[in-house]
Design a protein with these regions (language model features):
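FAD-site-proximal beta/loop scaffold in flavoenzymes
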Residues: 161-179
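Short, functionally important structural connectors and interaction interfaces within domains
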Residues: 82, 150-155, 164, 171
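Hydrophobic, well-ordered secondary-structure elements that form the walls
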Residues: 90, 124, 163, 176, ...
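FAD cofactor-binding and catalytic pocket of flavoenzymes
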Residues: 1-103, 108-111, 154-157, 179, ...
Length: 192
């Protein structure tokens, strides 16, 4: 699908998943387009113009004419399987202004996600090379931890609240209504 100056390329290897060394898949996100110059416009010119630092004066004008609007980026957003290192709990020492314990989150990428990112980096590199692209930096095929974002930074995380038909084993019923708080309905993605 296309959204503004973005295009999404759905997971294309679903039928070959058994041959890969990670579960799940990912989608590619292609971003480009022209827009009005801003204060950040010149920050990328030094990477492509071969200069030392951000250009000024005549060189900046030349680079702006040559490179502005000609950048393309490709990213990927992938599936993450639940693992024992990712959970939240009530913090025993920190309370909010009403005296209620706050949530403390624990997060760790598994080897599966890191292998997925290596695959993403290789696939996106091949796509960009086929387009004749020049790279600002070498892809992180062998260093996926440099390419992967912090958990929750890019995608909208869901889950954490169990939906079910037993109040002893779930937080909500099948309609997202909580068992313990009358008339409280969870309308976000927490139950998924």
């Amino acid at each position: 699908g296309v959204v503004g100056q973005q295009a999404y390329m759905p997971w294309w290897l679903a039928g070959q998943q058994h041959k890969l060394d990670f579960p799940g898949g990912y989608k590619a996100l292609l971003v480009s387009g022209r827009k009005m110059p801003s204060l950040n416009t010149g920050k990328s010119f030094d990477r492509v113009s071969g200069g030392d630092g951000i250009p000024f004066g005549k060189k900046l004008k030349e680079d702006a004419r040559r490179y502005h609007g000609s950048f393309q980026s490709i990213g990927a957003q992938g599936a993450m399987a639940a693992n024992d290192d990712c959970y939240c709990e009530l913090d025993p020492g920190v309370k909010d202004k009403w005296g209620i314990p706050v949530l403390r989150f624990h997060w760790k990428w598994s080897d599966d996600e890191l292998r997925q990112v290596s695959h993403q980096q290789q696939a996106m590199t091949e796509i960009l090379e086929a387009m004749g692209a020049r790279f600002f930096h070498a892809p992180y095929v062998d260093k996926p931890e440099k390419a992967i974002s912090q958990g929750g930074k890019i995608i909208h995380e869901v889950g954490g609240v169990i939906m079910g038909d037993n109040p002893e084993k779930s937080v909500t019923n099948q309609w997202g209504q909580t068992w313990d708080v009358p008339n409280l309905i969870l309308g976000d993605g927490a139950t998924f």
